[in-house]
Swiss-Prot record:
Subunit composition and interactions: Homooctamer.
Gene3D superfamilies noted in UniProt: FAD/NAD(P)-binding domain (3.50.50.60), Glucose Oxidase, domain 3 (3.30.560.10)
The species this protein was found in: Candida boidinii
EC top class named in words: oxidoreductase
SUPFAM superfamilies for the chain: FAD-linked reductases, C-terminal domain, FAD/NAD(P)-binding domain
Motif (Microbody targeting signal): 661-663
EC number: 1.1.3.13
Family: Belongs to the GMC oxidoreductase family.
Induction data: Induced by methanol. Subject to strong carbon catabolite repression.
Pathway: Energy metabolism; methane degradation
Residues the entry annotates as binding FAD: 8-39
PROSITE patterns per record: GMC_OXRED_1, GMC_OXRED_2
Protein name, per record: Alcohol oxidase
Entry keyword set: FAD, Flavoprotein, Methanol utilization, Oxidoreductase, Peroxisome
Length: 663
């Protein structure tokens, strides 16, 4: 299909949010011409997308489905540069993310203090996009006939129940629905953005774009195309200039597409502010320094960068336990078995993400008493009067989430943590008017001292969970904090007996130890009165007591390992132009997502969030997409039932061995 030069609506960015907007608007009126422009490749029937169990491949630094941005070095990360990825494929993060179904707390949206954006007002839109594929006691807060599917997947690793039992012993109760918008302390079996009918990832491109393009002729798609800038004339956005996704030699190849009615920028938290800045919207002095003529003065563009700070901690598990380690590390038999099962039935290890259970937690009064004064003050000002806000998240991954070439052989589980509401803030700005140039970027990871105590606290909590799990078999010491050798908190390696099982009878150096820094767990048990062994579970009856030196070791570990959770937001904050408490350096958008000072231009993606949300952010991206579609449609004069904008169902019929098409 030839691409015209003029459209009614242009959506810049085919990510999680942009696909919702373009798909919905194309279904409001068949005469409304909509163009969706995406920098990455088309994801249609791409097995790296629709097979849930191979998602770690998209996280590798050589991935073609993500762009990796390097930050300035940071003293808060022990001199490291942070690496912040952004999806680079149609569907955005929904095509490559962890597929973890979590939702924001009700107070999160209310705290944005934007007209039309309270949780009560957004809940119908949250229900609109989802089909909740499990028994439900909270039917008033979930949806059951939307295009995006939510389920447990079609496989569950045994670490699920093991983890939940261990959490109960720590006073973290099992909760049937931790995503009810109000519960902030509990453990649950983790739901996933997976269609249980087919064992396939549920992403916004297949749900909103491919389904619509099969049935409509008014939706146009361009992939492998980068948005350079929005052209503004007499205070109105009138066109979009594009370039190829990668430079072609020294030539300057560009195209310009006119928009008769509306332009929506939805390029993501990193790219959307850069598009605005290249368009002349931002801090004038910085725009001039980058070679851009200022048009609209909005200093808040690129400011208020936020993320969730995560870290992964591996633990050894017993050799008779199940994990995905063999599959992801290249075992041909394990891979063939998993692929054969999925293509035959849509079930098995490839029909899950391996993240089977997790917690949202708040500290007790006794735990808060151990926090430093800085965090205690932060707690009082931000959390204390909002009981629906969790402080930390952690979950169990049924294998080692990382590079297996750097790890001793064996089976593992990983505790995956992230801080729900960091106080730290960062920024980014274009370094030139070249659309291919990397930004000047400081994400601000861990630059607020109030963020350290909860990160250390969660490490201790999850470590106690791991030690109480039946499958627990030790701690790979090289991947844990480096405590003093005589510390009771020191990491304990797997037992000599488990080492023999991993190594096999022909291994000549198993259990050959140099020095005393790494102690096998069996030897430690002989001197540990708190350890009890039963036929059912290994139980450590008392929590580890940490010294100040131990805490310092954990803090240093956090500085060396804290990283993005792929959840960045805030760089085009929805706030008054002069700013407010959420965006003190100035807002970028009004409550209808219009860019201050420009007509016909909206921004709609996670960059609009003025404050953080306590969840994996895909659910928020979907909510923003649904809201933006309604706002655009209303601005175009549609109302009532026209705003339903129902998209056609994306049909899946057969499992095909080709791995190319499953309809």
């Amino acid at each position: 299909m030839a691409i015209p030069e003029e459209f009614d609506v242009i959506v810049c960015g085919g990510g999680s949010t942009g696909c919702v907007i373009a798909g919905r608007l194309a279904n409001v009126d068949e005469n409304l011409k909509v163009l969706l422009i995406e920098n990455g490749e088309n994801n249609l029937n791409n097995p790296w997308v629709y097979l849930p169990g191979i998602y770690p491949r998209n996280m590798r630094l050589d991935s073609k489905t993500a762009t990796f941005y390097n930050s300035r070095p940071s003293k808060h990360l022990n001199g490291r540069r942070a690496i912040v990825p952004q999806a680079n494929i149609l569907g955005g993060g929904s095509s490559i993310n962890f597929m973890m179904y979590t939702r924001a707390s009700a107070s999160d949206y209310d705290d944005w203090e934007s007209e039309g954006w309270t949780t009560d007002e957004l809940l119908p839109l949250m229900k609109k996009f989802e089909t909740y594929q499990r028994p439900c006691n909270n039917r008033d807060v979930h949806g059951f006939d939307g295009p995006i599917k939510v389920s447990f997947g079609n496989y569950t690793y045994p670490q699920c129940q093991d983890f939940l039992r261990a959490c109960e012993t720590q006073g973290i109760p099992y909760v049937d629905d931790l995503e009810d918008l109000k519960t902030s302390h509990g453990a649950e079996q983790w739901l996933k953005w997976i269609n249980r009918d087919f064992g396939r990832r549920s992403d916004t491109a297949h749900a909103f774009i491919h389904s619509t393009m099969r049935n409509k002729e008014n939706l146009f798609l361009m992939t492998n195309t980068k948005v350079d800038k929005v052209i503004i004339e007499d205070g109105r956005a009138v066109a979009v200039r594009t370039v190829p996704s990668k430079p072609i030699g020294d030539s300057k190849v560009s195209r310009t597409f006119k928009a008769r009615k509306q332009i929506v920028v939805s390029c993501g938290t990193v790219s959307s502010p850069m598009v605005l800045q290249r368009s002349g919207i931002g801090e004038p002095s910085k725009l001039r320094a980058a070679g851009v003529k200022p048009i609209v003065e909005l200093p808040g563009v690129g400011r208020n960068f936020q993320d969730h700070f995560c870290y992964f901690v591996p633990y050894r598990i017993k050799q008779d336990s199940e994990s995905f380690d063999a599959f992801v590390s290249g075992d041909k038999e394990a891979q063939k078995s998993a692929f054969d099962q999925w293509y035959a039935t849509g079930a098995g290890p490839l029909a899950t993400n391996g993240i089977e259970a997790g917690v949202k937690i708040r500290p007790t009064e006794a735990e808060l008493a151990t926090a430093d004064k800085a965090f205690q003050q932060g707690w009082e000002s931000y959390f204390e009067n909002k009981p629906d806000k969790p402080l930390m998240h952690y979950s169990v991954i049924s294998g080692f989430f990382g590079d297996h070439t750097r790890l001793p052989p064996g089976k593992y589980m990983t505790m995956f943590h992230f801080l729900e509401y960091p106080f730290s803030r960062g920024w980014l700005h274009i370094s030139s008017d070249d659309p291919y140039a990397a930004p000047d970027f400081d994400p601000g990871f861990m630059n607020d001292d109030r963020d350290m105590w909860p990160m250390v606290w969660a490490f201790k909590k999850s470590r106690e969970t791991a030690r109480r799990m039946e499958c627990f078999a030790g701690e790979p010491t090289a991947f844990h904090p480096h405590y003093k050798v005589d510390s009771p908190a020191r990491a304990l390696e797997q037992s000599a007996e488990d080492t023999k099982k991993v190594a096999g009878p022909l291994h000549l150096t198993a259990n050959l130890y140099h020095g005393s820094w790494s102690t096998p767990i069996g030897e430690a048990d002989k001197h540990d009165p708190n350890h009890v062994t039963s036929s059912h579970i290994n139980v450590y009856s008392k929590d580890i007591q940490y010294t100040k030196e131990d805490d310092e070791a954990i803090e240093n570990y956090i500085k060396e390992h804290a990283e993005t959770t792929w959840h960045c937001l805030g760089t085009n904050s929805m706030a008054p132009r002069e700013g407010n408490k959420n965006a003190p350096e100035g807002g970028v958008l009004d409550p209808r997502l219009n860019v201050h000072g420009v007509k016909g231009l909206k921004v709609a993606d996670l960059s609009v969030c003025p404050d953080n949300v306590g969840c994996n952010t895909f659910s928020t991206a979907l909510t923003i997409g649904e809201k933006a579609a309604v706002l655009v449609a209303e601005d175009l004069g549609y109302s009532g039932s026209e705003l339903d904008m129902e998209v056609p169902q994306h049909k899946l019929k057969t499992y095909e061995q080709t791995g190319a098409a499953r309809y």
